[in-house]
Amino acid sequence: MASKVLKGIRAIAFDLDGTLVDSAGGLADALDQALLAKGLPAAGKERVAAWVGNGADIMVERALTWARTKLTAQLHKETRELFDRFYETTVTTGSQLFPEVKVTLAELAKHNLPMGIITNKPTPFIAPLLASLDISEYFSLVLGGDDVKEKKPHPAPIYLTMGTFGLRKEELLFVGDSRNDILAAQAAGCPCVGLTYGYNYGESIALSNPDCILTNFSDLLSTIGLPSLKLQEA
């Protein structure tokens, strides 16, 4: 259960990878295929999960650095292009929702809370992923890494979300799993929830000092003062 209630929330924005979706498998499959195509070793899901969160360019850069190859702009460009090609397939085949995500989104929608997604993920991959997981209908705003000049941890996409929804900073809740998510929310001045699962570079989300820390996604309901799923089932 949530230990703290955030009042006055009128809309919620979510990170995507590591928050709503366990996408490490699909990312790792595509990145490993790209690395192997360049004659480099595959990194594997566990390593790739630690590189998620700053966008595809930085993920590819981290992979090439790990492979101890000479990092050039041309190699990075070619590897990124290969990753994009392979990820067109693995973005859907290698991704699944985290537990309780869909039922919680459905419950939030019943209360007419506008919801959005703010992710550093390349924009072309987002719509197919949401459609494959059957959650597109819940989001009236989706901002990908190609939709803003500055990605998280910069607050720009959160400011854009506030403006789109017509909200003051204290009325938008941002939910994420990494320090970049929490830093972006804090810079924008909006309340934030940190999830203990997901991809946070191997460190505890508590170190980023979010307003609330949740282990179960469905506890988001009680965090904003709505009945929990367990109470509804009782």
From Swiss-Prot:
InterPro entries: HAD-like_hydrolase_sf (IPR050155), HAD-like_sf (IPR036412), HAD-SF_hydro_IA (IPR006439), HAD_2 (IPR041492), HAD_sf (IPR023214), PGP-like_dom2 (IPR023198), PGPase_prok (IPR037512). Mg(2+) binds at D15, D17, D177. It catalyses: 2-phosphoglycolate + H2O = glycolate + phosphate. The keyword Nucleotidyltransferase does not apply. Disulfide bonds: none annotated. Specifically catalyzes the dephosphorylation of 2-phosphoglycolate. Is involved in the dissimilation of the intracellular 2-phosphoglycolate formed during the DNA repair of 3'-phosphoglycolate ends, a major class of DNA lesions induced by oxidative stress. Monomer. This is Phosphoglycolate phosphatase.
